[in-house]
């Protein structure tokens, strides 16, 4: 709770105490919803998931698939990201590979991995990112890389201004997109109402090889 208050005050210094308290209350309510929805997602049917998690413009990626191009998708831990990675293979033509950090508890990792991949998602541990990117499959693939997690190495991190503060970001998506000239798209997840979301894909960079380091991040 102390961390939440400190972050709000640093990010929004002009808010009143009443506004801070309101934001804090809404944050915990939203967090509880996300956690419960995430658990529900492990048993949710394909029909229910499609009804609750709607992709508005998946066809924007079809031209890349038709040309046999791999692409990179950069969502964030915003909205229900668990439903995002779970449902992504359903509307897209691309094969989906998700780069992620495995859980430490092997039993839980096995269960979560199995449930996350039941609609076609291929999970790739972050420790094997280089191997996966240097040996791409023949099938046009969309790589999901969450870039808003805390990097394990601050030396390799890319630094950006976020909510007025210097913030360390993972460099992998930026690095590999430029190295292989992969088109990069942002997945914007919008909460329509409780338990219902919409996703819109928007291009971040379609000529990644021509960009400078950290520009995509």
Where are these predicted regions, by residue range?
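Non-catalytic C-terminal accessory region of glycerolipid acyltransferases
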Residues: 14, 18-25, 63-67, 91, ...
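Catalytic core of membrane glycerolipid acyltransferases/transacylases, capturing the structured
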Residues: 67-128, 152-161, 165-167
């Amino acid at each position: 709770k102390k961390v939440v208050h400190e972050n709000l005050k640093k990010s929004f210094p002009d808010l009143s105490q009443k506004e801070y308290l309101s934001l804090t209350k809404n944050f915990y309510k939203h967090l509880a919803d996300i956690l419960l929805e995430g658990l529900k997602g492990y048993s949710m049917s394909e029909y229910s998931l499609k009804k609750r998690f709607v992709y508005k413009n998946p066809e924007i990626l079809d031209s890349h698939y038709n040309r046999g191009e791999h692409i990179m998708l950069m969502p964030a831990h915003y909205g229900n990201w668990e439903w995002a990675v779970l449902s992504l293979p359903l509307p897209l033509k691309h094969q989906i590979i998700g780069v992620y950090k495995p859980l430490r508890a092997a039993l839980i990792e096995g269960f979560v991995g199995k449930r996350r991949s039941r609609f076609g998602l291929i999970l790739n541990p972050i420790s094997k990112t280089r191997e996966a990117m240097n040996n791409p499959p023949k099938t046009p693939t969309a790589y999901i890389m969450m870039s808003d997690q805390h990097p394990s190495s601050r030396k390799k991190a890319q630094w950006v201004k976020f909510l007025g503060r210097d913030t360390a970001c993972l460099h992998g998506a930026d690095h590999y997109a430029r190295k292989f000239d992969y088109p990069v798209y942002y997945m914007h997840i919008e909460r329509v109402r409780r338990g219902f979301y919409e996703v819109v894909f928007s291009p971040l960079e379609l000529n990644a090889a021509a960009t400078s380091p950290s520009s995509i991040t």
